[in-house]
Amino acid sequence: MIFIKTTASAGTFESNDCLVTIKNAETLSIEIESVVFDQFGDQIHEVVLKTLKTLNVKNIHVYIKDKGALDYTLAARIITACKRLGVYHD
């Protein structure tokens, strides 16, 4: 029996971390829920876009539940979730 993954996650909902959940989509969409969104929402969005561009991923829905993760943590979680879903392209 073959199972096709439709969603993948990486991370935790602990302090200074984030939980990234991704799923296949028709277009790129990003949803961010963060305790520091007012201060760093634009920066978080930029890290997501930059990381997805590096991975050459365009058609995906990204949901991020953030508890103050640093940029490199956020990028690592996105990369891991993409690899788990199988949408990572070299």
Predicted regions and their residues:
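N-terminal intrinsically disordered, cationic/polar leader segments
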Residues: 1-90
